[in-house]
Structure formats: structure tokens, C-alpha cells
A protein has these predicted regions:
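Short secondary-structure boundary segments
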Residues: 134-163, 212-243
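Outer-membrane beta-barrel pore domains
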Residues: 14-26, 30-73, 108-109, 122-126, ...
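Bacterial N-terminal signal peptides
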Residues: 1-6
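Flexible, surface-exposed loop/gating regions in the mature catalytic domains
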Residues: 207-209
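Outer membrane beta-barrel
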Residues: 75-203, 267, 271-304
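Boundary at the C-terminal end of the N-terminal hydrophobic targeting segment
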Residues: 7-15
Length: 368
């Protein structure tokens, strides 16, 4: 993830592999071989090399007739090893863990040597799925949250049968301290009618420790400040399969956010529109998937965005712009991806002018 060191309000954690099958391949669990005798242990994993470049530009007004420009270029090269030891107690119940080792070639202080990043129990049967412990919470396309959490997630029903499925989550996000942790709950309803999929979600989260006042204090009352102590977000995603290979989706967002020390609150709406082409199969050489998205997203609608960029760069101004990604299977078990974003701030303030962020990155991931 590319983050401007001098401009970022916070440092988002490295995204982990979500459980939602709409996530990029490198963030999905690869199917494992089932056995007939229990218990048994299964271990799979991946190794990823990633390179990225980000260009960040911000204009600030020090006086009505004076504009100061800050330009920063960031390069990133990382190597990541992940192991997923699963203990299967029965066909329906398992203990799932993740070990991760991350090396940053540009900044050794950002290295994370082998550690236990995930530990949870999963029980799944017809029309019921329960997860409890530390796992990754990836909601829909990750426009609102893609983050490691400690908590409970319960799903009742199936999207494709009957009235659909209802998923409840309660818990808190992980972080270095209470100012970087959120506690809350969410509810997700999913259904499918032929080629049309519909998902409606509501999230209510609060920071464990309130953020301090934005500095300088003069900007605290505006969108030029940073962060929220409380956020409530409503999300509705419609996805339609135009052809077997082409899918269109529209993600509608409405959010409220408050920063207590700044005495600031906002209610805002936005959307993310996307087209996806192709179907990715890690077992089939030459398979691919490509998407393009247009973002018009308020900052209050973001808890932890999945994109490989820094949405906190835009403070409370929100952002709009384009993103695109291509995933390609070089050979079974080896995937190549390239991704890019061109974004700008959604609003200006009396203290800030144009903010622009351009990010491009590529990765090679081997699965085993």
C-alpha cells in the first residue's frame, strides 16, 4: 500500500485475504483437498512480490493569495509469505490460522517478521455459517472495509435460495492502539434473482479512543481536518451479469461521520460504478479478469478501503476518480496483476486546494 509519509493522516494496515469470493484472486482462499478422515491438518499458502509507485500532490492556502504546493513520490517493493494451517475437525468445523512474514525492501523498519495474523473457528452447514476469533472482514468490493477484526460473524440463509441471506457481525478492528481501533457492528442482506444480485449493508462503528483536535486548530471545523470518531454507513450494491463474462455493478453509499474534538459532523452520499470482464481460475493457464471503476466517495463512508493507495490522503474531503486492474494466470498456481488509480479530492476547503494521487503497481503471486 502506497502512503505519502508527510501527508497521510494514518497508516492503514496491509490488507489480508478476505472471505468474499468477489475479492481479487490474491486475496482469496485457494480451495484445499478434502479428506475422509478427521481430524486432519491442511497447509497452503502463497508468496507475493509487489512493486508500486505513487505520486501525491497537495495544494494548501497559507493566506488568501498564497498557495503552497507539496509534491511527494513514493516507491514500494515488498515480499510477502503467507501460510494457512487449517485443522479440520469435521466436514463442517475447522480451526483456521494464518502466519505472515512481510519484508519491505525500501524500509526495513516496516518489516513484519513471521507472526500469527489470524486465528478463528469456522462452522458451516446448509444455510448457516459461524466464524469467531480473529479473521478478515471484507465487505462486498471492499469500498467500505477490508480489515482484520476480532469478533463474531454469523450468516443465516443462502444468497441464491429462498429470501436470501442475512449476515451479522459484531467486534472490533485491530490496530496499534485504541486510537487506531474501531468497535461496532454491521448487518448485510444478500439476494439473487436470475442475473441480478443485490446487497444491502448497514455499519455502525466508533473509535475506542477519540482522536485529538486537527492541527492547525483553524482547520478542525472543516473537511480539511482528519478522521472520524463515529461513523454510520449504509451501502447498497446492485450487480448485473450482462453476459457470462461481463458484469456491471453500482455501489450506492450514504454515510454520517463525527469528530468530537473538532466539533465536526457531516452527512454525505456517493457511489462506485464498475465493469468487470473475464473470469479468473487459478488452475487454468491464460484465464484473466479485468475491471474498471469510477469512484465518487465521501470520506465518512470509508472505514478501511481495500485499494492499494491512501484514501486518508484526502482527509475529510472525500475523493473521486478512476481505478483499473488486470489479473492474469501465467500458469496454474502463478498469477500476475497490475493495478492503477488516478484520484483527486471531492471537495475543496478554505485551507486546501487540489489534492491529486496517482498510483500504479504490479505483483507476481505464487500459490502452493
Amino acid at each position: 500500500m502506497l502512503i505519502p509519509l508527510g501527508l497521510s493522516a494514518s497508516s492503514p494496515a496491509v490488507p489480508e485475504r478476505p472471505v468474499d469470493d468477489t475479492a481479487p484472486l490474491e486475496n482469496q482462499e485457494i480451495p484445499v483437498t478434502e479428506k475422509n478422515t478427521y481430524p486432519y491438518v491442511d497447509i497452503h499458502g502463497d508468496y507475493r512480490w509487489l512493486w508500486g509507485r505513487g505520486q501525491f500532490r497537495a495544494d494548501s492556502r497559507t493566506a488568501p493569495d498564497k498557495v503552497r504546493r507539496h509534491d511527494e513520490r513514493i516507491y514500494l517493493t515488498t515480499r510477502r509469505l503467507r501460510l494457512f494451517p487449517f485443522i479440520h475437525f469435521s466436514e463442517k468445523t475447522s480451526l483456521r490460522t494464518q502466519l505472515e512474514d512481510l519484508r519491505n525492501d525500501k524500509d526495513a523498519n516496516a518489516d513484519h517478521h513471521l507472526y500469527l495474523g489470524r486465528l478463528y473457528v469456522q462452522h458451516e452447514q446448509a444455510r448457516l455459517k459461524v466464524e469467531a476469533g480473529r479473521f478478515n472482514y471484507y465487505l462486498l468490493d471492499g469500498n467500505v472495509i477490508d480489515k482484520k477484526v476480532d469478533g463474531l460473524r454469523l450468516r443465516l440463509g443462502e444468497r441464491t435460495t429462498g429470501p436470501g441471506s442475512l449476515t451479522f457481525f459484531a467486534g472490533r478492528t485491530t490496530g496499534s492502539d485504541d486510537r487506531h481501533r474501531l468497535r461496532g457492528w454491521s448487518l448485510l442482506y444478500s439476494s439473487q434473482h436470475g442475473r441480478l444480485k443485490s446487497d444491502a449493508a448497514y455499519l455502525d462503528f466508533r473509535r475506542l479512543q477519540d482522536l485529538p483536535s486537527s492541527r492547525p486548530s483553524l482547520i478542525g471545523q472543516s473537511r480539511a481536518g482528519t478522521g472520524f470518531d463515529e461513523q454510520r454507513i449504509a451501502e447498497w450494491r446492485l450487480m448485473y451479469e450482462l453476459t457470462p463474462k461481463l458484469t456491471a455493478s453500482l455501489d450506492l453509499l450514504h454515510a454520517w461521520g463525527r469528530h468530537d474534538a473538532d466539533g465536526y459532523d457531516t452527512t454525505d452520499s456517493g457511489f462506485v460504478a464498475a465493469l468487470t470482464y473475464g473470469h479468473l481460475d487459478e488452475r487454468q493457464k491464460g484465464s484473466y479478469e479485468a475491471w474498471i471503476r469510477y469512484y465518487d466517495q465521501p470520506s465518512a463512508s470509508i472505514l478501511y478501503h481495500t485499494m492499494d493507495g491512501d484514501t486518508t490522503f484526502f482527509r475529510r474531503m472525500g475523493f473521486c476518480g478512476w481505478g483499473a486492474r488486470l489479473d492474469y494466470i501465467v500458469q496454474p498456481g502463478l498469477a500476475w496483476a497490475v493495478e492503477g488509480f488516478s484520484l483527486k479530492n471531492r471537495h475543496h476547503t478554505a485551507w486546501t486546494g487540489a489534492f491529486r494521487e496517482t498510483v500504479i503497481g504490479t505483483s507476481l503471486t505464487a500459490y502452493f
